[in-house]
């Protein structure tokens, strides 16, 4: 883990005390260094506190593994060995790592795109889905600019990312475009991506690997004079033109309530999986203008947030 990750881990562990200072322990796995997951975690900690489980009664052990299979597995294993009372994960890869490491500890996930399709399901697990309709994102994009080819940057080893890429292919006939799949296994591979002459827009999938390389991907798209779209919150601040994502506050709050119920003795099977009800649409007018894209007023009116 890099120095930066350790610093961020310390900053996010505001609700944690040294092991043994509280009656209960909650383990959390945050995939990569994503601003969206950081916001989810803040909402999670606040929600847990409102339910009566603050730093005086619960220790929070946060793991921020690099976005690769070995790191996810190691993070889950460390928390299982620590004998936490509940395990929480943000993103599908971390959730799958938890499933593989324990069948007895209650598990809670948040921010998972299409949980069932990604295999994020177990008898000792519940959570809140992070899926919003991809078709809605494409409708908004079509209002902004015509497109016949969309490049999707994803990771073949992150099942929710793969599912999103597959859904994009399924929407080709409805919207009249072709999908250009661009797989990367590590963030540094994003530098090799070429969009010019190949795509009219770029979708950065929900992949933790792809989102760690967001600044590189956005820059490559700028050079190709094409917009970037996303379904991960916080990406518009990095130059994404159009972002449609589930509210991180809702995701974290729901996870917090679920963990509180588990700490009180309920079983995961008695807590139904939730779906997002709050969706945030962010339009980056500044980036759109730099690309020569005129955003229609009705799209601006629909936006939850506009970056000027």
Predicted regions and their residues:
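Bacterial N-terminal signal peptides that target proteins for export
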Residues: 1-8
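N-terminal signal peptide c-region/cleavage motif recognized by signal peptidases
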Residues: 16-18
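Short hydrophobic alpha-helices and adjacent helix-cap/hinge residues
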Residues: 21-308
């Amino acid at each position: 883990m890099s120095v930066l990750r350790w610093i961020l881990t310390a900053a996010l562990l505001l609700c944690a005390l040294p092991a043994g200072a509280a009656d209960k322990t909650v383990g959390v796995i945050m995939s990569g260094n994503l601003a969206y997951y950081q916001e989810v975690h803040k909402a999670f900690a606040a929600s847990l506190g409102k339910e009566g489980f603050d730093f005086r009664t619960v220790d929070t052990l946060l793991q921020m593994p690099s976005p690769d299979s070995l790191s996810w597995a190691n993070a889950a294993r460390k928390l299982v060995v620590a004998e936490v009372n509940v395990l929480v994960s943000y993103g599908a890869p971390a959730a799958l790592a938890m499933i593989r490491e324990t069948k007895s500890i209650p598990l809670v996930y948040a921010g998972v795109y299409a949980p069932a399709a990604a295999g994020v399901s177990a008898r000792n697990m519940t959570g809140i889905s992070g899926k919003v309709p991809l078709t809605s994102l494409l409708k908004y994009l079509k209002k902004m600019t015509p497109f016949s080819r969309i490049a999707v940057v994803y990771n073949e080893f992150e099942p929710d990312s793969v599912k999103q890429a597959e859904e994009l292919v399924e929407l080709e006939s409805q919207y009249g475009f072709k999908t250009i799949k661009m797989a990367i296994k590590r963030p540094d591979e994003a530098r090799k991506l070429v969009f010019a002459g190949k795509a009219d827009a770029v979708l950065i999938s929900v992949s933790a690997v792809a989102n760690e390389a967001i600044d590189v991907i956005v820059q490559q798209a700028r050079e190709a004079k094409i917009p970037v779209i996303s379904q991960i919150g916080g990406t518009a601040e990095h130059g994404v033109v159009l972002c449609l994502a589930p509210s991180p506050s809702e995701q974290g709050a729901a996870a917090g309530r679920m963990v509180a119920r588990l700490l009180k003795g309920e079983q995961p099977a008695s807590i139904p999986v939730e779906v997002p009800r709050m969706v945030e649409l962010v339009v980056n007018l500044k980036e759109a203008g730099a690309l020569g894209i005129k955003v229609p007023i009705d799209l601006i009116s629909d936006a939850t947030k506009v970056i000027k």
